[in-house]
């Protein structure tokens, strides 16, 4: 990677082209990340909500709106100002035009002072992973290496450094205060009654306070109902929370494979993901240079990063699942924990006795991690070594504050297999493992399916809450039908909105490439926009305080034909503007009181405004009628007297 480090207001990098040679694709990504600067969306500005201490500044995006025409004349129109709309922002420094960015140096270590002042960590005397030490001494990797790698920390002897530990001790950390400000979304800035109106929700038992306080955050984490993924070796991340009593979150998957992609392309996808609303990102790399790719991603990520460590462990044994050992896996956990991975997906619930339950399935075991562990169990006719060594896994996680995402290795891969014996047997085991992890103050969330028809979705949520003790649920979709390859972001978005409403805390996006290939950056955007819609729809249905503000602002702008405001309030302003301009590209189209769907004579909103004006005129006439005593006829003298007055 060459030096000098920009995300333009709109994407200027060449569109992915399957026919373009691999080197050209990589060069395009390199050009993109090496010309990066902080920008925000059209007519938006970066604001910071100030906490109780100088170094708690929570980034938000504020959408500036144009005023509403309320009367006057053509020469002297009268306007009423519209309030700016604050929205949750995951883009970190990449959304701040004043930020100094260089991917070769990495992001500012926001959380480092908070970690240091707790005085419960220390630098590792020597890197704990043999594999890491080998990589760092390999001169052949120098051209790929991130050169500003920090020295890793771990917990001091007999100390716990997890956010769950602090919460249980009654300690409100700066991370918790940061999150409380962030979850409230600056809605206290909104004064207008029209914008603040909201329908009551159906929360299915979720507790949604009108104002989220740092103490509420602490209580939810202490109870295990929420997690704060925040490895002490990823101080660049901005604190966020995953739990059903908070905003529904969205995860994006990136990662290279043995077939395609490069470090440059994955860093580009990371930045792209945070721009379009990824609350967390999972690096699912399975090809060469996994270690080096992950270092670049972590040092440049403002959001928590998750991984599936078994993927890299499998690479270390050249793809032979039967050759995996606990020692290799343990070394991989230490390697990733000291790099700064915030949460691990661990398939510890795939037990030997559950594997035969999948024999009668239509699609068998579709989870990569699940199939790897099933093959290992059958090859050795032994119990899953992740299950056998789970307490040791927890000890490692507790030393670095790595959260556990207990993987659903037996999730259904087709709607025919939904809600079967194998799926729920594993889920119940994940509940047992959750209690063990909590013994070590390790934060836990539970992964869920998968392919589930709509009428069977809610049972997944109720089973998880009951058997996994209300630990946060994190699902892939679920996909509600199997007939739409190329459109599985739609089929899964339906299920995601439903299960988010029922209480799922985080939704793992699905891209149009699901079941077809490795997603490029355009697919990442499509998947994220789809899932931001699903998450927001779930927040509205649950009745999350303030969730409807942006919808109300959009509806008001739509009724008043403020086209630019409509574009800017959209989740994807560029696409909204482009679709409008396909048929009305002229500047006059941005002030017209109609669009190309209905035209000027059939616009329902224009007609509705005319009806309102007519009704207002009728009301004035009615008032005048009542003022005259409700008499139909008046003497000429009375009328003449009024006219002269």
Curated annotation (Swiss-Prot):
Cofactor(s) for this UniProt protein: [4Fe-4S] cluster
Source lineage: Bacteria, Pseudomonadati, Pseudomonadota, Gammaproteobacteria, Enterobacterales
Family: Belongs to the ThiC family.
BP GO annotations: thiamine biosynthetic process; thiamine diphosphate biosynthetic process
Binding, Zn(2+): 451, 515
Protein name (record): Phosphomethylpyrimidine synthase
EC number(s) from the headed UniProt entry: 4.1.99.17
Pathway: Cofactor biosynthesis; thiamine diphosphate biosynthesis
Annotated TM spans: none
Record: residues binding substrate: 253, 282, 311, 347, 367-369, 408-411, 447, 474
Known role: Catalyzes the synthesis of the hydroxymethylpyrimidine phosphate (HMP-P) moiety of thiamine from aminoimidazole ribotide (AIR) in a radical S-adenosyl-L-methionine (SAM)-dependent reaction.
Organism field: Photorhabdus laumondii subsp. laumondii (strain DSM 15139 / CIP 105565 / TT01)
Assembly description: Homodimer.
Residues involved in [4Fe-4S] cluster binding: 595, 598, 603
UniProt keyword terms in alphabetical order: 4Fe-4S, Iron, Iron-sulfur, Lyase, Metal-binding, S-adenosyl-L-methionine, Thiamine biosynthesis, Zinc
Region named Disordered: 1-25
Catalysed reactions, as listed in the record: 5-amino-1-(5-phospho-beta-D-ribosyl)imidazole + S-adenosyl-L-methionine = 4-amino-2-methyl-5-(phosphooxymethyl)pyrimidine + CO + 5'-deoxyadenosine + formate + L-methionine + 3 H(+)
Biased composition (Polar residues): 1-12
Gene3D superfamilies reported in the protein's UniProt record: 6.10.250.620, Radical SAM ThiC family, central domain
């Amino acid at each position: 990677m060459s030096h000098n480090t920009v995300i333009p207001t709109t994407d200027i990098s060449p569109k992915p082209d399957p026919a373009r040679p691999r080197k050209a694709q990589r060069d395009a990504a390199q050009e993109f990340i090496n010309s990066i600067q902080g920008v925000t969306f059209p007519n938006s500005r970066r604001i910071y909500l100030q906490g109780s201490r100088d170094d708690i500044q929570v980034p938000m995006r504020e959408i500036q709106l144009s005023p509403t025409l309320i009367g006057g004349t053509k020469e002297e129109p009268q306007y009423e100002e519209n309030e700016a709309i604050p929205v949750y922002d995951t883009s970190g420094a990449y959304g701040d035009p004043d930020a100094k960015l260089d991917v070769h140096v990495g992001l500012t270590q926001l959380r480092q002072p908070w970690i240091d002042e707790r005085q419960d960590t220390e630098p590792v005397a020597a890197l704990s992973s043999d594999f890491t030490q080998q990589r760092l001494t390999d001169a052949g990797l120098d051209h790929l290496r991130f050169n500003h790698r920090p020295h890793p920390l771990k917990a001091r002897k007999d100390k716990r450094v997890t956010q769950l530990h602090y919460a249980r001790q009654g300690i409100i950390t700066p991370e918790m205060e940061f999150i409380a400000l962030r979850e409230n979304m600056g809605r206290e800035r909104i004064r207008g009654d029209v914008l603040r109106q909201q329908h009551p929700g159906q929360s299915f038992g979720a507790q949604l306070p009108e104002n989220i306080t740092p103490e509420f955050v602490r209580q939810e984490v202490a109870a295990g109902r929420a997690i704060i993924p925040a490895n002490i070796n990823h101080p660049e991340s901005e604190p966020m929370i995953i739990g059903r009593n908070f905003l529904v979150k969205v995860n994006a998957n990136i990662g290279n494979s043995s077939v395609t992609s490069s470090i440059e392309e994955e860093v580009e996808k990371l930045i792209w993901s945070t721009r379009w609303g990824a609350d967390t990102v999972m690096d699912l790399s399975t090809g060469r240079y996994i270690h080096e790719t992950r270092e670049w991603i972590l040092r440049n990520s403002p959001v928590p990063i998750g991984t599936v460590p078994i993927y890299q462990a499998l690479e270390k044994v050249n793809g032979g699942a039967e050759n995996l050992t606990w020692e290799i896996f343990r070394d991989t956990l230490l390697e990733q924990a000291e790099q700064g991975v915030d949460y691990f997906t661990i398939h510890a619930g795939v037990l030997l006795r559950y594997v035969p339950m999948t024999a009668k399935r239509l699609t068998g075991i579709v989870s990569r991690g699940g199939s790897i562990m099933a093959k290992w169990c059958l090859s050795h006719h032994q119990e899953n070594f992740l299950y056998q060594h789970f307490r040791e896994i927890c000890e490692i996680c507790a030393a670095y504050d790595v959260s556990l995402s207990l993987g659903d290795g037996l999730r259904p891969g087709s709607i025919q297999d939904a809600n079967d014996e194998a799926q729920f047997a594993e889920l119940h085991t994940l509940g047992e493992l959750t209690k063990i992890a909590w013994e070590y103050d390790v934060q836990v969330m539970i992964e869920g399916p998968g392919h589930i028809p709509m009428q069977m979705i809610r049972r997944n949520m109720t089973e998880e809450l009951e058997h996994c003790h209300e630990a946060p649920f994190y699902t892939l979709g679920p996909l509600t039908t199997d007939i739409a390859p190329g459109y599985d972001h739609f089929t899964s978005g339906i299920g995601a909105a439903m299960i988010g409403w029922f209480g799922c805390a985080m939704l793992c996006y699905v891209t149009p490439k699901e079941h077809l290939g490795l997603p490029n950056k355009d697919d990442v955007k499509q998947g994220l926009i789809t899932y931001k819609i699903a998450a927001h729809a779930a927040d509205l249905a649950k009745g999350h305080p303030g969730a409807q503000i942006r919808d109300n602002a959009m509806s008001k702008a739509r009724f008043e034909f403020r086209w630019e405001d409509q574009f800017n309030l959209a989740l994807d302003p560029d696409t909204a503007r482009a679709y409008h301009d396909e048929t009305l590209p002229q500047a006059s189209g941005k002030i017209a009181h109609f669009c190309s769907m209905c035209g000027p004579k059939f616009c329902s909103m224009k007609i509705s405004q005319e009806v309102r004006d007519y009704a207002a005129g009728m009301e004035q006439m009615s008032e005048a009628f009542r003022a005259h005593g409700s008499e139909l006829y008046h003497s000429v003298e009375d009328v003449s007297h009024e006219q002269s007055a």
